[in-house]
């Protein structure tokens, strides 16, 4: 494989050479090349190509040989994170160390080689189709709209009929989604047939999130409590973007909401990232929630 597609060489290419490489890849894989863009976040950076296909935006992520997994702190936690963990340990009567506790939920340390790839820049919700409120498939069910009016009168922000339809308040109006349930194998096949794409493996997902960093989070060994985080907003955060949802050093919006399980490739249904909100809903706080 072309060594220029791997990060050590890719990062040293002249912009003119990188531009030619990206245009060549776009032609080969039937993508529309948009531009070169420099992404920088949390001490890592990558100037790479942005592409488009079928209304989706993709980014080229160079490959690399990296260390994944976690077993111990590199920098150590600050006082705020230590105190948050100590309170939780006292509540659950845990007497071991923070590293021992966290290690239980981590994959083992290993060296892996990740191949270069095109990656969709944003998470996509599976099985839900965004539709206008006047879509015939919505208006054909006046009972849905009647129930929605009842919920709206109670100042509710959302209304969902299981595996059928979902409505969410959008300012003074509402947005609608229709549900199209599918199995994990069906989704994998649809990716292959419709996009000639696949889900990332768990190792690829970890690389896309952390780039091979050795700290607990991409920015360090503790949660930055100055960040605006989903499910832990306060009044001062109004109008600000969610920090972890902003593009990372590869230009990806990934692993930013503990309520969202992110599908990865496996023989059976496999997810990374969020736990469906179990820790957050269970009162474990932002650190263990994320």
Annotate each predicted stretch with a short phrase:
Residues 1-198:
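Extended beta-strand/loop cores of jelly-roll/beta-sandwich
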Residues 166-285:
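Functional-site microenvironments in short loops/helix caps that host divalent-cation chemistry
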């Amino acid at each position: 494989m072309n060594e220029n597609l791997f990060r050590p060489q890719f990062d040293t290419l002249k912009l003119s050479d990188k531009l030619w490489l990206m245009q060549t890849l776009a032609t080969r894989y039937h993508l529309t090349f948009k531009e070169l863009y420099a992404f920088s976040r949390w001490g890592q950076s990558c100037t790479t190509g942005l592409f488009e296909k079928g209304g989706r935006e993709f980014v080229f992520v160079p490959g690399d040989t990296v260390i994944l997994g976690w077993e111990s702190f590199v920098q150590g936690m600050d006082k705020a994170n230590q105190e948050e963990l100590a309170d939780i340990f006292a509540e659950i009567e845990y007497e071991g160390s923070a590293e021992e506790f966290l290690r239980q939920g981590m994959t083992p340390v290993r060296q892996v080689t990740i191949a270069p790839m095109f990656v969709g820049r944003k998470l996509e919700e599976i099985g839900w189709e965004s539709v206008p409120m006047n879509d015939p498939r919505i208006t054909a069910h006046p009972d849905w709209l009647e129930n929605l009016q009842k919920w709206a009168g109670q100042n509710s922000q959302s209304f969902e009929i299981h595996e059928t339809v979902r409505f969410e308040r959008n300012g003074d109006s509402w947005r609608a989604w229709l549900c199209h349930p599918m199995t994990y194998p069906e989704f994998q096949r649809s990716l292959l047939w419709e996009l000639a794409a696949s889900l990332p493996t768990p190792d690829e997902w970890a690389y896309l999130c952390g780039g091979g960093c050795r700290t607990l989070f991409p920015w360090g060994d503790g949660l930055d409590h100055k960040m605006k985080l989903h499910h832990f907003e306060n009044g001062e955060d109004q109008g600000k973007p969610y920090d972890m949802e902003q593009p990372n050093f590869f230009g990806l919006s990934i692993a930013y909401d503990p309520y969202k399980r992110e599908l990865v490739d496996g023989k059976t249904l496999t997810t990374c990232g969020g736990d469906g909100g179990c820790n957050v809903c269970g009162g474990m706080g932002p650190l263990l929630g994320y």
